[in-house]
Design a protein with these regions (language model features):
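Short, solvent-exposed loop/beta-turn-alpha elements that line the ligand-binding surface or hinge
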Residues: 55-69, 108, 150-171, 230-241, ...
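A structural signal for short loop-to-beta-strand junctions that line the ligand-binding cleft
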Residues: 23-24, 31-32, 63-100, 129-130, ...
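Hinge/lid segment of periplasmic solute-binding proteins
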Residues: 37-93, 108, 117, 142-145, ...
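Extracytoplasmic/periplasmic substrate-recognition and gating elements
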Residues: 105, 180, 219-284
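Conserved N-terminal structural module of periplasmic/extracytoplasmic solute-binding proteins
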Residues: 1-48, 59-65, 232-237, 347, ...
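Extracytoplasmic/periplasmic solute-binding protein
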Residues: 75-88, 93, 117-160, 204
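Glycine-centered hinge/linker elements that transmit conformational signals in sensory
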Residues: 120-123, 159-188
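C-terminal capping/gating helix-and-loop segments adjacent to ligand/active sites or protein-protein/ligand interfaces
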Residues: 78, 284-290, 304-357
């Protein structure tokens, strides 16, 4: 395409830039290809109805988005459920395990709830904290995975008016786990950094955290990431993951409907979203949206995180992506009381949802 010039107008994605993009789409000045948000941040651009769906593009280019994981395409779908953007990278949350502690006590990794309960009991009996967490500071990851596990991805993603039974069932596991002795005795007073040190120093066996946590773990050889085990009676499929993919490459109708630009636009996006390109964008950090190979310099923990995220059966966004900040703060602040039995999950969730509906 020696007759085509690519103009790169990349900028920081701040509010001013988002306003400029929305204005460009509104007045017919949109680009041919854009890497942009896929979530509610894209609402103004989506309202202009100037982006082509992947389904439409695949009719002419069957290999379009061909290297992209199905779970990543679904996660990058717009709020209306239509897949238009081809993502490159994202982040994941998962269960970090000190595998050497599991091996020391002859335990299997907690790939199902029976193994989780066995591990908690055995570690507690041997003076190892089963789960590093600060319930008063950052119970976020446990909120997400327990509710997702109980409700399944579809019901986890809704924003109801009153507390759903499955959400309550998920949060009730905080008390179950606390009663088992799964958490540090001072989980109500320590902060998240202290909880993280318990895991890193091998005083605790497990910790739920995000892909950003992996690089700070000192023992990259004996630490692994596993899928969160489904709680008893939970509706989530095994391998369900909390994570996020919030941007991707779009083709606009302006380029798609132009015979001189359609082929170039499609091949440009394919060049930036194939396995090799995604490997470059990803660089070993977070989640790769395509099935990539481990980098030569990746640690065993890095490879474990890659394998875990690539095998995810579904990717669900965190709870705070659907609730107002005020409502979410109330949810987080109420977890200690739920874990001690001082407050029921139903009572807490009804307050959260009532505030969220304001």
């Amino acid at each position: 395409y020696d007759y085509i010039t690519i103009e790169d107008d990349s900028q920081s994605s701040d509010q001013d830039w988002k306003a400029k993009i929305a204005a460009d789409f509104a007045v017919g000045n949109e680009p041919d290809v854009i890497q942009y948000f896929t979530d509610a941040n894209a609402s103004d651009v989506l309202a202009a109805n100037k982006l082509v769906s992947i389904e439409e593009i695949k009719k002419s280019y069957p290999n379009y988005a061909g290297d992209t994981l199905d779970s990543a395409l679904i996660a990058a779908a717009n709020p209306d459920g239509v897949e238009r953007a081809v993502p490159t990278t994202g982040y994941w949350e998962g269960l970090f395990c000190n595998k050497d502690l599991f091996d020391q006590y002859g335990l299997e990794l907690p790939t199902d709830w029976d193994k989780m309960e066995t591990a908690i009991k055995t570690f507690k009996e041997n003076g190892i904290i089963p789960i590093a967490v600060s319930l008063n500071n950052v119970p976020h990851y446990w909120i997400e995975f327990l509710m997702l596990s109980a409700a399944g991805p579809e019901d986890y993603a809704i924003v109801p008016k009153t507390a759903p039974e499955d959400w309550c069932k998920g949060l009730a596991m905080f008390k179950t786990l606390r009663d088992m002795g799964a958490f540090p005795v001072d989980t109500d007073t320590i902060d998240n950094d202290f909880a993280g040190e318990l895991f890193k120093n091998k005083q605790a066996a497990m910790q739920l955290d995000g892909s950003w946590y992996a690089g700070g773990v000192p023992d990259q050889e004996n630490t692994v990431v596993t899928a969160f085990p489904v709680i008893p009676g939970g509706k989530a499929p095994a391998g369900s993951m909390v994570g996020g993919i919030s941007s991707g490459f779009y083709i606009t109708k302006k380029a798609w409907d132009d015979p001189d630009k359609r082929d170039a636009a499609a091949k440009f996006v394919m060049a930036h979203t194939n396995k090799d390109a995604v490997t470059t964008y990803w660089g070993g950090n977070g989640q790769a949206a395509a099935k990539v190979d481990p980098l030569d310099d990746m640690t065993p923990l890095g490879i474990s995180g890659l394998n875990y995220s690539s095998a995810a059966t579904c990717i669900s966004a965190p709870t705070d992506s659907r609730l107002s900040q005020e409502a979410y703060n109330i949810l987080v602040a109420g977890i200690v009381d739920v874990s001690t039995g001082a407050r029921t999950p139903e009572d807490l969730l009804n307050e959260v949802l009532q505030v969220n509906a304001k």
